[in-house]
Amino acid sequence: GRVDFYQNKFYSNIEYVLKSEDAIKQGGQLSNRFVTGGSAILFNTGYSKSGFGIDATFRRLENMNFFSERNAAGNVFNESSINYIPGLTKQHDYLLTNIFVYQAQSTVNLDTSQSGEIGGQLDLFYKIKKETLLGGKYGTKIALNASYWAGLSGDYIQDNPDAGTLPSYEVELFGFGGKYFSDFSLEIRKKWTPKWRSILYFVNQSYNKKIVEGSGAMITSNIGVIESTHKLGNGKSIRFEAQKLNSDSAKHDWTGGTIEYNLNS
């Protein structure tokens, strides 16, 4: 079911999806000892006017993966997936900001106490007016994004035929479990002259490699980007870009850069 509401500059919608009982694949095997349903809640709201906009999204997934062949559950390429579920995080533009990319977690895995995800995303845009101290002659555009995703808090029971217990789990409706991913970004776009403009970009990420990829630990990183474009006239321009990623993982410290010359024939 879905309900939408719009009034002037405000909008809001909520959606609820229910999945019927389905066999859960555990340890590479399907068994009728572990059969349960799933659900999804999605809520989105926002407000926009000239020079300002805000958008907030909340989502809760529980056992919402669905495949045309049940044995395909858990494959890393999402083959046979019927309802692909995207991760609700910012789509970054730069190379080093896309090393740790979050995937929506909708599967059940009792070994890692997983049954889905809960979290949200917030987008904020503001344009500082022209002819002000921070806006300057052409104005300044600022964009903020924050997202946070965690597991579902609850109790997870392993299959134990000797003890007479069936595999199962019971989770809280709005309970937050272990952290899966977080992303905070700040983008500043500034036009200096009719021919010269720049972008300053900062991102802080936490990425639970064990949950998203199946092995590893939490990786926290900070990424900074500077980009500047200068128009040379006659359809020609030169663009410079410098990127730096620092993390608490010895294998994930990177530096990158680009110099690009564009011509329009």
What spans do the regions from the language model cover?
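Exposed, low-structure sequence patches enriched in small/polar residues
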Residues: G1-S265
